[in-house]
UniProtKB/Swiss-Prot annotation:
Species for this entry: Pseudoalteromonas translucida (strain TAC 125)
Signal sequence residues: none
Protein known as: Glycine--tRNA ligase alpha subunit
Protein encoded by which gene: glyQ
Keywords annotated in UniProt: Aminoacyl-tRNA synthetase, ATP-binding, Cytoplasm, Ligase, Nucleotide-binding, Protein biosynthesis
Primary enzyme class: ligase
GO terms of biological process kind: glycyl-tRNA aminoacylation
EC number: 6.1.1.14
Pfam families: tRNA-synt_2e
Length: 300
């Protein structure tokens, strides 16, 4: 008998947290800032840099303003959830561990078709790339699997293994529904609550904001301010708050993109500006950890 009701969204999350905790991961809480992917969380981006080991898992709410569809598309959201697993150094049996996690949420890997489709990953704004695969479950992509080669322009040694589950997609498969809004979020003593009950109105209103009301002039000013603040903090040898300003600049850029306020040429220029900040934060973080003697390294 399963410990958690994986046919609910919250039960699926609890089962994944429990499984990865048993594999030795520290269960981290979500970052309290707008990010486009779980990789932006400092626990992935910064902790992948340098020799110090760290394995963690966490849920991360993600915002991608351009993906909003006013709550009318059953498969597209501007706000959704990823479950992120970061294993450093990447263990030799990482694929087996992943397949074990599928079994933990009730998926039979002998009868369900699980395919690893080569799909190398790159994040231009983070100066990061890695060798990887999309993982398809009976024809639906549910996970991205990446071995980080470089983060913030710094070579990864040791290599970090990242597993990113698309929670809504995985839940749709497990629950057998065709619309995200029909997913059962919880089914308890107070009754059944669906994903739509929790988030449909938010999708309608946030899509309206992202596409119609976000103040373009203010967003351009916000980007410039965050960029300047990040540069100042890097000079002050404060890479963590400097990186928070990078994430804020990145979200401002994403909103400008949703408002169609940036031309194709300008778009590349803004991406390069964020990338330069990311790389500066990464180098500053590495230098600071090195000055501390990489304290999380056990073998000295």
């Amino acid at each position: 008998m399963q410990k958690y009701d994986v046919k609910t969204f919250q039960g699926l999350i609890l089962a994944l947290q429990d499984y990865w905790a048993q594999q030795g991961c520290v269960i981290i809480q979500p970052l309290d800032m707008e990010v486009g992917a779980g990789t932006f969380h400092p626990q992935t981006f910064l902790k992948s840099i340098g020799p110090e080991p760290m394995s963690s898992a966490y849920v991360q709410p993600c915002r991608r303003p351009t993906d909003g569809r006013y709550g009318e598309n059953p498969n597209r959201l501007q706000h959704y959830y990823q479950f992120q697993v970061v294993l450093k150094p990447s263990p030799d049996n990482i694929q087996e561990l992943y397949l074990g996690s599928l079994a933990a949420v009730g998926i039979d890997t002998l009868t369900d078709e699980v395919r690893f489709v080569e799909d190398n990953w790159e994040s231009p704004t983070l100066g990061a790339w890695g060798l990887g695969w999309e993982i398809w479950l009976n024809g639906m992509e549910v996970t991205q699997f990446t071995y980080f080669q470089q983060v913030g322009g710094i070579e990864c040694s040791p290599v970090t293994g990242e597993i990113t589950y698309g929670l809504e997609r995985l839940a749709m498969y497990i629950q057998g529904v065709d619309s995200i809004y029909d997913l059962v979020w919880a089914d308890g003593p107070l009754g059944r609550v669906t994903y739509g009950d929790v988030f449909h109105q938010n999708e309608v209103e946030q899509s309206t904001y992202n596409f119609e009301h976000a103040n373009v002039e203010d967003l351009f000013a916000q980007f410039d301010k965050c960029e300047a603040e990040s540069q100042k903090l890097i000079e002050a040898n404060l890479p963590l708050p400097a990186y928070e300003q990078v994430m804020k600049a990145s979200h401002a850029f994403n909103l400008l993109d949703a408002r169609h306020a940036i031309s194709v040429t300008e778009r590349q220029r803004y991406i390069l500006r964020v990338r330069a900040l990311s790389k500066a934060c990464a180098q500053s973080y590495y230098d600071k950890r090195e000055a501390l003697g990489f304290p999380l390294c056990k073998d000295k």
